[in-house]
Swiss-Prot record:
Domain free text: Composed of three domains: a modulating N-terminal domain, a DNA-binding domain and a C-terminal ligand-binding domain.
Spans annotated as Hinge: 194-217
Sequence ranges of Low complexity compositional bias: 12-29
Annotated DNA-binding residue span(s): 125-200
Gene, per the UniProt record: rxrgb
GO biological process per UniProt: cell differentiation; nervous system development; positive regulation of transcription by RNA polymerase II; retinoic acid receptor signaling pathway
Assembly information from the UniProt record: Homodimer. Heterodimer; with a rar molecule. Binds DNA preferentially as a rar/rxr heterodimer.
Similarity comment: family membership: Belongs to the nuclear hormone receptor family. NR2 subfamily.
SMART domains: HOLI, ZnF_C4
Subcellular location: Nucleus
Any one GO CC term of the record: RNA polymerase II transcription regulator complex
Organism: Danio rerio
Keywords assigned by UniProt, alphabetized: DNA-binding, Metal-binding, Nucleus, Receptor, Transcription, Transcription regulation, Zinc, Zinc-finger
Listed name of the protein: Retinoic acid receptor RXR-gamma-B
Highest taxon, organism lineage: Eukaryota
Amino acid sequence: MDTHDTYLHLHSSPLNSSPSQPPVMSSMVGHPSVISSSRPLPSPMSTLGSSMNGLPSPYSVITPSLSSPSISLPSTPSMGFNTLNSPQMNSLSMNGNEDIKPPPGLAPLGNMSSYQCTSPGSLSKHICAICGDRSSGKHYGVYSCEGCKGFFKRTIRKDLTYTCRDIKECLIDKRQRNRCQYCRYQKCLAMGMKREAVQEERQRGKEKSDTEVETTSRFNEDMPVDKILDAELSVEPKTETYTESSPSNSTNDPVTNICHAADKQLFTLVEWAKRIPHFSDLPLDDQVILLRAGWNELLIASFSHRSITVKDGILLGTGLHVHRSSAHSAGVGSIFNRVLTELVSKMKDMQMDKTELGCLRAIVLFNPDAKGLSNSLEVEALREKVYASLETYTKQKYPDQPGRFAKLLLRLPALRSIGLKCLEHLFFFKLIGDTPIDTFLMEMLEAPHQIT
């Protein structure tokens, strides 16, 4: 496949028909290089919107301008920040009296029972009692947003259990509500959400099974899993034959090999995102923001699933097999072990298929908490559609595994935590300058980012 064809811009319709926009994004073909290799690197923002070494930027193909100060890389850690506070799930039981025990620090939040609507038109003025986002109404006894409503419902219906990796006092707000499921669930209970309301809703749903089937069908039509599978297959690298890498026979160290593979996969990531239903319908700036926010997790998920076919190592998109021993000798053994244990091994044990992988990656892509989005509610609605389609798919494809959907979602916190730790390593390698980092990966690392 021709390199330039792979990097076609995300929006298929002409973006420069308006005379007010500069005609710089109409085509990847013949895009001029504006920076020579002999000149010093430009500022991060100008780097992202330009090409380097005669090759176009992977993100210049999806937006006419990246110089807007409103665009930033969400949730990117810098050196010295602790990234191990990502939510993790385990077998800790949360049934019984513990369900209604509010976590420490929630008492001063006030009683939401006094927060009443004065008129039907004032409903939109309510805020979510859990995270402070815009409320969509009263759900399970509490004014809440669609995100917290869906989170609470999934927790109860799937009987999910969580644990807090901190001191059970995590801040739950619009920006950080997904960081700790344990504290988010406890806050739902503390604010008055009722478990029995979810169970009653399920019973009513059984009495209206025909309506539920129709709704599920509509969700599947809105977010068809076959389209998501097509997206995965369209960018799948040909790795029928691969080269083994070890300290004795590899000219490059594993970190260099991984960075080189990530650089190549950034282009296919753009092509993959274009094929995910409704992604191309989002504003171009939002598309850029979502890809910047999730590129590391999206790439890690891909090579982790690809690696279930090899033994004690990871299989890169370039066809190179990196052994565990090579990673340890390069000083990245700890994070390498986590990838193998928390991702590759789990995917292999449950025999995760390509459709399920694609849905998990789509969930990561549609991140409503990415900073700078023009409409986070729209992105959250798309994520909910992926949830619904994935749940329906697992029930139909694996009817003998009722807990499979929950097991799939359990991989997301681990993926998040590992993705943040990998970014820490990349920033370190970039800082010390010992590892060659290719053009497009460097652009992502130099993009403006914020710490959450």
